[in-house]
Design a protein with these regions (language model features):
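Structural microenvironment flanking redox-active thiols in thiol-disulfide oxidoreductases
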Residues: 60-124
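A short beta-strand-turn-helix
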Residues: 27-48, 69-74
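Cleaved targeting-peptide boundary
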Residues: 19-26
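Positively charged n-region of N-terminal signal peptides that target proteins for export
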Residues: 1-4
Length: 179
């Protein structure tokens, strides 16, 4: 009896974990200039996220510095910052290795950045399809989406809202349980 109860509890816990991760995050994508992939549900279920569409040759590209600072400041509170390289606005390097150089060497980014993909419209990758349907597709590079630990898309900020903007920081504090 105890064994079947324990098995039932494990099954219930697995079912609850699966329900906690929404379909749009239940996808596996390749990291920038790498063969390594990330399944967002497996890696980040139950964690708040800041998801950003990025480009290497944009006037907003220096926001990588602030995004890295957010990553460093909030990672211990569970926040996951993820960049999505995209050429939808024609400002990403054609070669992924060059895009990776900008991210990881020039801006010293340590948070995950995904391989170049589309982030808007019918060609959007599954993550941005979900974000776009919930809060609108990005109209330019460096749009920021705040996602709760339950996978709810809480807010969408345009490019002009920088990583240190009070309105963004307030929401990040809310989803991480900070001040």
């Amino acid at each position: 009896m105890k064994k079947s109860l324990a098995i039932g509890m494990i099954g219930l816990a697995a079912s609850a974990a699966a329900q906690a991760c929404p379909d749009y995050l239940n996808t596996e994508m390749r990291k920038l200039s790498s063969k390594e992939t990330i399944n967002f549900c497996d890696s980040y279920a139950g964690k708040p996220m800041l998801i950003v569409n990025t480009a290497s040759n944009c006037g907003y590209t220096p926001q990588f510095t602030g995004l890295e600072q957010l990553h460093q400041n909030y990672k211990d509170q569970g926040l996951v910052v993820v960049g999505f390289s995209s050429d939808d606005f024609f400002q990403e390097e054609n070669d992924e290795a060059d895009a990776a150089t900008v991210c990881f060497e020039k801006y010293d980014v340590s948070f995950p950045v995904m391989a170049t993909s589309s982030v808007r419209g019918r060609n959007a990758n599954p993550v941005f399809k979900g974000l776009g349907e919930a809060q609108g597709y990005p109209k330019w590079n460096f749009n920021k989406y705040v996602v709760s630990a339950e996978g709810e898309v809480v807010a969408h900020f345009g490019s002009r809202v920088g990583p240190s903007s009070p309105e963004l920081l307030t929401l990040i504090d809310e989803v991480t349980g900070g001040e």
